[in-house]
Amino acid sequence: MSATATLPAVRGKLTPQAPLAPLVWFKSGGAADWLFEPKDVDDLADFLRDLDPAIPVMALGLGSNLIVRDGGFPGVVVRLGKAFAKVEPIDATTLRCGGGASGILVSSTARDAGIAGMEFLRSIPGTVGGFVRMNGGAYGGEVKDILVDCDVVLRSGERKTLALADLGYTYRHSELPEGAVVVGATFRGRPGASAAIQAEMDRISASREASQPLRSRTGGSTFKNPAGHKAWQLVDAAGCRGLMVGGAQVSEKHTNFLINTGDATSADIEALGEEVRRRVKDKSGIELQWEIQRVGKAE
């Protein structure tokens, strides 16, 4: 797809050859052919309906769980802005959340409304759209535990509300169709005291700060935990703590995190991940699966 291709008219913002490195946590990777920031759901649905179906579409949240390859993304990247970031209680235990709302906003709104069970979202560095797509989870909670339903715009531009059962959730995976964009979700918790909810959020924050390289350029958890194992322990046992490829390094603080030490390319980061997978397979016989999404084309 060329940046001169004719795209449907929009009311939001459409940027050709948009650099993606500033928008992802690793701060590496190439440009998107187009970056689309829709004004509202109608704008998004109309655009996808009229867009050539051969053009790939990818939703981008906070860019935390993502490697964008150095050749960029050959298609349209959709980024939901403030119009999609609202969170509001709809009853004593239920929140209605926009697809662009952060986990921090959802969990703090739940706290203020006295809704427990969503504290774990405080620790997920992403948006509702991202963690609904991948059944995000941490600290004993997963999206499947709180999701009632979600609103999506399919690649065809059709709008649909999908119930929890429609998503086919497994560990860090859903059956959400390719090119679909999650524009909203309904989460249900349980009644709780705001002070106790805040205390649990504080505990989670302190645990993350102590154990994860939060101030580094990282993508979050790199590999899924295999059944009965912790990925970080397998990586450590294979001698990969501190291992480097180019400017990419396995974190000394938490071995299931890769970090960009300053000048890493996405190729460095992905190659490091593959080298870790190879060493773990050689050491333990276990084949680690990527949790981080890798998209786009190599340079």
From Swiss-Prot:
HAMAP family: MurB. It is found in: Cytoplasm. Its cofactor is FAD. The gene is murB. It comes from Sphingopyxis alaskensis (strain DSM 13593 / LMG 18877 / RB2256). The keyword Repressor does not apply. This is UDP-N-acetylenolpyruvoylglucosamine reductase. Pathway: Cell wall biogenesis; peptidoglycan biosynthesis. The lineage of its organism: Bacteria, Pseudomonadati, Pseudomonadota, Alphaproteobacteria, Sphingomonadales. PANTHER family: UDP-N-ACETYLENOLPYRUVOYLGLUCOSAMINE REDUCTASE. It catalyses: UDP-N-acetyl-alpha-D-muramate + NADP(+) = UDP-N-acetyl-3-O-(1-carboxyvinyl)-alpha-D-glucosamine + NADPH + H(+). The active site is at R172, S221, E291. It is an enzyme of class 1 (oxidoreductase). GO terms for cellular component: cytosol. Pfam families: FAD_binding_4, MurB_C.
